[in-house]
């Protein structure tokens, strides 16, 4: 059975009035957000298209940068292994974003969340 999972991922500023960090992407701002639907496997580094549909939304305003994910995946295939905080294991399903504010590819902010409620930043 395919289930639809919503993960609200990150907000640089959690005190914005327009976006509520509640796991739902139902605010009107998400309708105008930049949408990404093409994803590739990076661990292992095969760069093949992923089998499961994922939608990522990026929205920014003067209050911050907001990223939301909607993951569609058969529940029986989910890996929700618990990992230690800040452990970037390939043994679990996760969504992550990298932000290189300088655009020079020498440093970036990496933020991730996994099915087992593990966090990485």
Q: Where on the chain are the PLM-derived regions?
A:
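Sec-dependent N-terminal signal peptides
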Residues: 2-14
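Structural preference for beta-rich elements and adjacent junctions enriched in aromatics
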Residues: 15-121
């Amino acid at each position: 059975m395919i289930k639809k999972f919503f993960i609200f991922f990150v907000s640089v500023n959690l005190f914005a009035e327009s976006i509520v960090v509640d796991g739902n992407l139902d605010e009107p701002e998400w309708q105008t957000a930049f949408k990404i639907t093409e994803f590739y496997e990076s661990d292992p580094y095969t760069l093949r298209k992923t089998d499961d549909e994922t939608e990522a939304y990026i929205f920014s305003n003067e209050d911050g940068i907001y990223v939301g994910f909607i993951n569609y995946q058969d529940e029986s295939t989910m890996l929700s292994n618990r990992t230690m905080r800040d452990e970037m294991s390939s043994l679990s399903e996760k969504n992550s974003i990298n932000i290189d504010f300088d655009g020079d590819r020498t440093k970036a902010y990496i933020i991730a969340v996994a099915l087992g409620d593990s966090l990485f930043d």
